[in-house]
A protein has these predicted regions:
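N-terminal leader/linker segments that precede catalytic domains of diphosphate-processing enzymes
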Residues: 1-248
Length: 248
């Protein structure tokens, strides 16, 4: 998320037609990898505590790896690094730090370096205070490929451009949530239900700071899991969300 004048904008990316969710506009992201569990190295790069993160997500352990995955995926997919130098100074990906981190990103995408190696070499400290759990969606059981997806909201750092990777992602845009929904309704962009519902969930907030502050200390129990259900009505599949009539 970023603040643009009086409007809050969200970053959407278009998936390649050759990838999962091809041609759809989605949020940057991906799966949690085993390398996202920094374990003994975590305190060197973050104020995250795995116990607290796990409580926030209502999981038994490994909660901090979700935040690490969020940071890593944003860097891989759109070149945004949600981190500072350990001395507190901002990383300038527009100018002085640009070439070095462009090289890191290319090597990370091609599996020639790990994200932990980058963090160790550059002595990075994650901007975790501005990354908050936002929603939790589970793929309905009628699908053969199912996902258990945690969505996070993160504030865009200053002095960083966004650049989609050009492989899995073919386009990216900053747009207000309401304008994105309008474009989807008009058929200008394609998106699936979790994306549109997450966008609608931002409508009650006037600024990025307001939204981040609201979700900062919410536990998973306050962020209800959303499992869409589908039933055939007159030979056609109809979807229901929790709270809709006929959901149970």
């Amino acid at each position: 998320l970023r603040q643009s004048n009086n409007d809050m904008e969200v970053l959407l990316v278009e998936r390649s037609s050759n990838s999962a969710f091809g041609d759809l506009y989605v949020f940057p992201g991906g799966k949690v990898d085993s390398e996202d569990d920094f374990s003994d190295k975590l305190s060197s790069h973050s104020d995250l505590n795995d116990v607290d993160c796990s409580k926030l997500l209502d999981v038994e352990g490994g909660g901090a790896s979700f935040w690490v995955a969020c940071i890593r995926e944003c860097f891989e997919e759109v070149g945004v690094l949600l981190a500072r130098n350990k001395d507190g100074s901002m990383i300038d990906l527009n100018n002085k730090d640009k070439d070095r981190f462009v090289d890191y990103r290319e090597r990370l995408i091609s599996n020639k370096i790990s994200f932990l190696e980058i963090c160790e070499r550059e002595n990075l400290f994650f901007e975790t205070t501005n990354i908050v759990p936002f929603s939790h969606w589970i793929t309905p059981d009628i699908e053969t490929k199912r996902f258990d997806t945690r969505f996070f909201a993160a504030e865009m750092p200053k002095d960083q451009p966004t650049l989609h990777d050009g492989n899995e992602l073919t386009n990216s845009l900053w747009i207000t949530p309401k304008e994105a929904i309008k474009k989807a309704w008009n058929g200008e962009i394609k998106m699936i239900l979790p994306t549109s519902k997450n966008l609608e969930q931002t409508f009650d907030f006037n600024s990025t700071n307001e939204l981040i502050s609201f979700y900062k200390d919410k536990r998973s129990s306050e962020i209800k899991s959303i499992l869409p259900k589908f039933k055939k009505v007159d030979g056609k599949w109809e979807g229901r969300l929790p709270g809709d009539e006929g959901y149970e």
